């Protein structure tokens, strides 16, 4: 079995402060007053109508039950060329020890593994819900719920690009139907766009590089891979076999640093 406690120590590896003040998990939970699916959360209660009015928060439940593999037609995407530069046994070490030695970090806030960010948004897991805030305004735009194992409600496991939400639905355990896949969901039109095949993703985070998603899958007695998915269709366009399951991925410049259960990989991306 995978020693998840080893991974959790990487929590201190992320950025702890932001340029603006955001609600933490407890204050988020306290500020939400749900009255059903149509309930809204207004960040600035004093804002009136007009330019200063905060947008209504959209509450969306993404139902993935019975949704099989979906790949719409889309432009072909060339995968990145991934070349293993180094492969080192780590003695089942703590992930943060290796990342700190490389002066790397994940875009995290705090130490609870529930708060991360990108250039446009901040993402906060609170209970079963994912809150998405706009960096510039601090407004909460979306509150999303979708099925995924609580082991995986951490890391950088969500991404919003042009109103399209990219997420992971994971089951912690051996391979089984309808588990460990990525999906893309149109939040404005409440529509699933694609759903990758089973057993394509159970990494604790994924990376978006232009038109490619880098993620990975593996488990005890199963083969372990890094996968590249077409961002627009969810199709696997390339794979790279590793010796152990990839769990955390950190890109820096043209290098990808991959921590696994018992190996550390440095991979060149071209």
Annotate the PLM regions:
Residues 50, 54-110, 139-149, 191-197, ...:
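Aromatic (tryptophan-biased) beta-strands that constitute blades/sheets of beta-rich domains
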Residues 69-70, 79, 107-117, 149-161, ...:
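Repeated scaffold domains used in trafficking and secretory/extracellular systems
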Residues 124-125, 173-179, 218-223:
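Short, solvent-exposed loop/turn segments at conserved positions within beta-propeller repeat blades
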Residues 135-137, 186-189, 230-233, 269-270:
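Short loop/turn segments that connect beta-strands within beta-propeller blades
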Residues 250-270:
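Blade-level signature of beta-propeller repeat domains, shared across WD40, Kelch, NHL, RCC1
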Residues 9-12:
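C-terminal motif of bacterial Sec signal peptides marking the signal peptidase cleavage site
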Residues 14-16:
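Bacterial signal peptide processing site
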Residues 129-131, 181-183, 225-227, 263-265:
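A short loop-to-beta-strand structural motif that recurs across blades of beta-propeller domains
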């Amino acid at each position: 079995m995978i020693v998840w406690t080893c991974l959790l120590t990487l929590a201190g590896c992320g950025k702890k402060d932001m340029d603006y003040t955001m609600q933490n998990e407890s204050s988020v939970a306290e500020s939400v007053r749900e009255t059903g699916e149509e309930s809204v959360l207004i960040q600035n209660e004093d804002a009136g109508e007009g330019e200063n009015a905060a947008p209504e928060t959209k509450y969306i439940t993404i139902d993935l039950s019975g949704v099989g593999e979906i790949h719409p037609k889309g432009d072909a995407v060339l995968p990145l060329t991934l070349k293993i530069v180094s492969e080192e046994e780590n003695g089942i070490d703590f992930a943060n020890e290796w990342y700190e030695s490389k002066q790397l970090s994940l875009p995290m806030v705090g130490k609870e593994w529930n708060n991360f960010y990108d250039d446009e948004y901040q993402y906060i897991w609170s209970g079963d819900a994912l809150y998405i805030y706009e960096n510039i305004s601090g407004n909460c735009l979306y509150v999303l719920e979708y099925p995924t194992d609580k082991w995986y409600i951490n890391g950088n496991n969500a991404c919003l690009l042009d109103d399209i939400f990219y997420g992971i639905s994971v089951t912690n355990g051996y391979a089984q139907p309808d588990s460990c896949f990525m999906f893309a969901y149109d939040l404005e039109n409440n529509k699933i766009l694609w759903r990758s095949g089973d057993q394509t993703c159970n990494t604790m985070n994924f990376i978006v590089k232009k038109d490619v998603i880098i993620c990975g899958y593996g488990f005890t007695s199963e083969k372990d891979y890094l996968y590249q998915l077409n961002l627009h269709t969810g199709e696997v366009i390339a794979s790279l076999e590793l010796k152990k399951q990839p769990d955390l991925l950190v890109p820096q410049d043209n290098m990808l640093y991959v921590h696994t259960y018992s190996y550390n990989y440095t991979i060149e991306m071209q």
